[in-house]
């Protein structure tokens, strides 16, 4: 029997009724999230057996908005691990990991890139060798956000060197709190330290902590990366109108801790919001060339927002992440570069003065923009990789010739 899909209004009414009986401002954040998870309203688009309601993807935003309008905390840390394990993991993993992930009891990080395997992620060389009931892991990962306080990691390692490179990779869940895992912060040229490098020396993973199948982890990795591109824009937690109490205070503290890592992300995106007023304040808006470049920037920014809307609309219909993610990321990179160009035109040589200098424009924000924008074209997959994804998967263009294609990775890595 086909069940009729509820309307947004009926979903909102049901959420309001539930929150009325369940929300208590005196609850701790963990206790409140336990209630959310148990009710299915934490991630309503997930299946009912896995803490959801079996609703369409658009219901997630509808429910979060209604929970907040009722004065309750609506944020739940599903991250990238949640949808990946839900889609690709076995049932015992869903039972073991999804609930503590949603309640915030366990923090996750992503351990994919390596010093010599960033854009060519399938060229990774971190190894995992089965030893009885455990995998023994050795190697190095890099550009790992949140690794310094994570409990678990989404982790890729090579488990077979005698097959083509994409075929010998396995996707694991790595316990981070063990002697064989060393995490070191990476200091960036904009003086932030948002990422880490992780050194693995005989670290151990339970034999069955494999997402998908052994040697077939590339499929699961693609699912994670698709979600990363699709949800690449950081959404700030919203707390307006929420009843004061322990849950709100803890949610604010949690959001503030997460935000430390991303404090420079607005600068990485180019700070388009500052351009017009800055041009007016300096008189640069009287220059027709500057005005032309500002108009170009604002047009690009508007087009980029439409691409983001397309991605959201695709998700609302339940369609898996498609080329909109890569197209949107490219658009954001182009906007950021154009914004940096315009900021430099407006501020001139003063654009390079840091915040400590009294002559620095906007307290050094422009200088931080100029040295942060290059990251927009690298993080989460370089512009070149996005072009390849669009050409290959969306346009059906032939791939670049690869003389090592089909060779065992033990041989192919020498090309």
Question: Can you say where each PLM-predicted feature lies in the sequence?
Answer:
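Internal helix-loop-helix
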Residues: 38-105, 146-152, 301, 308, ...
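A short core secondary-structure module
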Residues: 133-134, 138-186, 196, 222
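Glycine-rich beta->alpha junctions and the first turn(s) of the following alpha-helix
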Residues: 181-302, 376, 412-415
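A short, Trp-centered hydrophobic/proline-enriched beta-strand micro-motif
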Residues: 104-112, 154-156
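Amphipathic, small/basic residue-rich leader segments at the start of a protein or domain
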Residues: 1-78, 86, 96-100, 246, ...
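A structural signal for short hydrophobic beta-strand segments in well-ordered beta-sheet cores
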Residues: 126-129
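C-terminal helix-coil-helix/basic helical segment that borders enzyme active sites and/or dimer interfaces
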Residues: 24-27, 280, 284, 288-291, ...
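Glycine-rich phosphate/cofactor-binding loops in nucleotide/flavin-utilizing enzymes
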Residues: 11, 58, 62-63, 80, ...
């Amino acid at each position: 029997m086909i069940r009729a899909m509820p309307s947004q209004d009926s979903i909102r009414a049901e959420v309001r009724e539930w929150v009325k009986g369940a929300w208590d401002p005196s609850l701790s954040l963990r206790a409140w999230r336990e209630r959310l998870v148990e009710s299915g309203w934490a991630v309503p688009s997930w299946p009912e057996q896995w803490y959801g309601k079996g609703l369409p993807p658009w219901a997630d935003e509808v429910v979060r908005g209604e929970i907040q309008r009722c004065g309750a905390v609506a944020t739940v840390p599903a991250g990238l691990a949640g949808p990946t394990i839900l889609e690709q993991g076995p049932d015992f993993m869903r039972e073991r990991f999804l609930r503590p992930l949603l309640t915030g009891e366990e923090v996750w990080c992503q351990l994919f890139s390596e010093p010599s395997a960033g854009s060519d992620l399938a060229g990774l060389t971190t190894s995992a060798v089965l030893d009885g009931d455990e995998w023994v892991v050795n190697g190095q990962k890099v550009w790992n956000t949140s690794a310094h306080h994570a409990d678990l990691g989404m982790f890729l390692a090579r488990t077979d060197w005698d097959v083509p490179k994409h075929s010998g990779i396995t996707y694991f869940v790595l316990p981070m709190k063990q002697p064989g895992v060393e995490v070191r912060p990476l200091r960036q040229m904009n003086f932030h330290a948002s990422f880490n490098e992780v050194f693995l020396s005989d670290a151990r993973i339970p034999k069955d902590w494999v997402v998908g199948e052994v040697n077939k982890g590339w499929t699961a990795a693609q699912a994670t990366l698709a979600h990363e591109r699709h949800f690449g824009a950081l959404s700030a937690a919203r707390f307006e109108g929420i009843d004061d109490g322990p849950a709100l205070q803890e949610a604010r503290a949690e959001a503030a801790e997460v935000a430390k890592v991303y404090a420079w992300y607005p600068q990485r995106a180019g700070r388009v919001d500052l351009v017009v007023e800055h041009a007016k304040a300096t008189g640069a808006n009287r220059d027709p060339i500057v005005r032309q470049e500002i108009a170009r920037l604002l047009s690009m920014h508007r087009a980029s927002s439409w691409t983001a809307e397309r991605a959201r609309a695709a998700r609302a219909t339940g369609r898996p992440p498609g080329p909109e993610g890569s197209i949107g990321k490219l658009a954001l990179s182009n906007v950021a570069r154009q914004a940096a160009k315009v900021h430099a035109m407006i501020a001139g040589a003063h654009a390079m003065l840091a915040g400590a200098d009294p002559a620095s424009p906007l307290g050094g924000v422009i200088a931080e923009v100029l040295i942060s924008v290059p990251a927009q074209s690298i993080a989460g997959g370089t512009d070149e990789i996005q072009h390849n994804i669009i050409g290959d998967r969306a346009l059906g263009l032939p791939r670049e010739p690869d003389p090592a294609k089909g060779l065992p990775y033990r041989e192919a890595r020498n090309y």
